[in-house]
Amino acid sequence: MKNISEYLNYPLSKPIGFLLTDIDDTMTTDGQLTSEAYASLFKLQRAGIKVIPITGRPAGWCEMIARFWPVAGVVGENGGFYFHYADKKMHRWFSQSTGVRVDNQKKLEIIQAEVLKQVPGAEISSDQFCRLTDLAIDFCEDVKRLPNSDVKKIVQIFENHQAIAKISSIHVNGWFGTHTKLSTSLTMLKNLFGLTPDEAQQ
């Protein structure tokens, strides 16, 4: 990873209009959002740069982030949805229909039971109660860090059920579907700001 200072004099073909960023261990330091990091969001907003957090964190968190942070929207649960607050109204877009999400939650409950049975020390993430599209298994946030072999075992259990599983810095997140952080970010940029995928990635 390179220090951002290396890019201070990087030539740009046009001004920066958007900043898409992770939250955990990117915006946060030791699990906390510092005053400096939060203040920087307001500075970016004043500079005309639209900030969009892209996170594996749950719908409950994203509701608050979209409503109270100076951001243009937020992509949550690894692309399961995006939320956008404007004109005193929360706008929510989901990668899947309500019926599909309900069916997937039932399948995730089976995976949850299997993980807790087969991987001692693993726990359901403390924020699982406000998730709508995925299952998050805690392997080091609020539990003693599990060995890498156990983390890989959790991933394998998800994959044995044909679910997608991704390892973050604190959780293994699993879901059903083809959505990703990138795909939903591109959908959000198109729906809200009219950017094509090519324009968004320039």
Q: What does each model-identified segment do?
A:
Residues 1-21, 191:
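Non-catalytic pre-domain segments flanking phosphatase-related domains
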Residues 17-19, 72, 201:
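The start of beta-strands in P-loop NTPase/AAA+ ATPase cores
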Residues 13, 68, 194-197:
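Alpha-helix termination/capping residues and helix-transition junctions
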Residues 111-202:
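Conserved acidic, metal-coordinating active-site core of Asp-based
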Residues 33-127:
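Active-site phosphate-binding/coordination module
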